[in-house]
Amino acid sequence: MVRVRLAPSPTGTLHIGTARTAVFNWLYARRHGGEFVLRIEDTDKERSKSEYTSNILDGLKWLGIDWDAEPVIQSERVEQHRQAIQQLLDAGLAYRCYASEEELNAMREAQMANKKAPRYDNRHRNLSHEQEADYQAEGRQATVRFRIDDSRNIQWNDLVRGAMSWSGADLGGDMVIARRAPADQIGDPLYNLVVVVDDAAMAITHVIRGEDHIANTAKQLLLYEALGLPLPEFAHTPLILNQEGRKLSKRDGVTSVSDFRGMGYTASALANYMTLLGWSPPEGMGERFSLAEAAKVFDFQRVNKAGARFDWDKLNWLNGQVLHELGAAELNRKLTPLWQEAGFETSGRSQAWLEQLCELLGPSLTLLADGVEQARPFFETPSLKEDAQQQLQQPGAKEALKALLSSLSDEPLQAEQAKALISDACKAADVKKGVLMKSLRGALMGQLQGPDLMESWLLLNAAGQDRGRISSALG
């Protein structure tokens, strides 16, 4: 059975790249009737925080990504990691390295001065017992390093990239698998070792992650072999790039799922877009689909090797499509909390009125957040912008508004009645209909742009806001 995992580190909020990796893993599991599980990699004690774990889990749930088992907490498995390191030490496949940080820095500086790539020179690979005893007598602590054969050619078949090979000589020398500790102890186990141990313990069959892990995969394959563990298959997906073609990072501003959510993007649009970041849907499917629909056809043959450039226009288009498809009641459920957060008084408005407002605004929305500013004139009396003020100075504009105002009563307007009042006021002031309509929009909305005027007027009339605004505009 296919079993895949997402293994986020809770050192920050859910990044869009991590979320895209989650989407690909989830799609692959669902396509093959397998399981999608989580592992929280919280071994960075200083930076890992429970609030980040909560943010990651909440973000996945919001996107519609569910998991099939309780999340594994990596820090609770340290003893299993140390047992694996001890196994490698006992087999002579790992050793203790007493090189100090100062010595290692000097080594790297000398290499760079000679225009060589920095790497560990394996200086403590074959220490004698006497040499080890001397270092211990000095009070030196030791890391644990895994032996890497420079002549080894590491090969695997990548589900995205095909045949892959990596030279052992390009892995930077013998790899540290445990932090510095007294020589009779094993320090904190490090990433490449713990990932291998945990993936094997969790029966992971496919490791799906970003291409920035390719070098790690070469190292991890050696560890799988040394520990006698079954190999998973690997798929390295393209990185998400910014508009300049560089890896998307915090310097680009919006990178976390929380940011997108706060800006008013919907979960379905964001999940839809992340699926398209590096995957091409089959011909005829189009670009608008749900995760469930994508799961029926997802495969790695359609995952691109090249980096996926983040396209804000496409995301905005998808989000607009989602919002336009929402019914008024559903859109109201999404917008009302935002209106209340903005300080709009919604409690005095009926559900029917709020839903009519949503129906009016819906077709013009790209983001949910757009619905706040577009709705503002329906809750707060706007000041007249310059274009509205200029319109009211047009010949006959104020006379027509006065005629219209005099015909209004406390009774709520109906559409046909409103049209008749407009016609009568135009005749009374001897102006063209366009003059009055623009002037009425300026008086009601504070500007000459906005949603359908007649529907806007009827909503404001129903809320008892139209006569006061017209009167105020007339001065």
Swiss-Prot record:
It catalyses: tRNA(Glu) + L-glutamate + ATP = L-glutamyl-tRNA(Glu) + AMP + diphosphate. Its EC number is 6.1.1.17. A motif ('KMSKS' region) lies at residues 247-251. GO terms for biological process: glutamyl-tRNA aminoacylation. GO terms for molecular function: ATP binding; glutamate-tRNA ligase activity; tRNA binding; zinc ion binding. The keyword Cytoplasm applies. Catalyzes the attachment of glutamate to tRNA(Glu) in a two-step reaction: glutamate is first activated by ATP to form Glu-AMP and then transferred to the acceptor end of tRNA(Glu). This is Glutamate--tRNA ligase.
